[in-house]
């Protein structure tokens, strides 16, 4: 779990940017989006094979 403490004399915007950066590094937001709706195993396999095909070319 990402945790960001606001430093002394740091603006909220800067702290929020640091927090969002840490979330993206961990992959938390991507994981939440992926788990938001159920995905059938056949669809997962299809996406996985398409991603492999894209990497190949």
UniProtKB/Swiss-Prot annotation:
Keywords for this protein: Ribonucleoprotein, Ribosomal protein
Region (Disordered): 32-57
Family annotation (InterPro entries): Ribosomal_bS21, Ribosomal_bS21_CS, Ribosomal_bS21_sf
One GO term describing the cellular component: ribonucleoprotein complex
GO annotation, biological process: translation
GO molecular function terms noted in the UniProt entry: structural constituent of ribosome
Biased composition (Basic residues): 33-57
Domain of life: Bacteria
NCBIfam families, per the entry: S21p
Family: Belongs to the bacterial ribosomal protein bS21 family.
Protein name stated in the entry: Small ribosomal subunit protein bS21
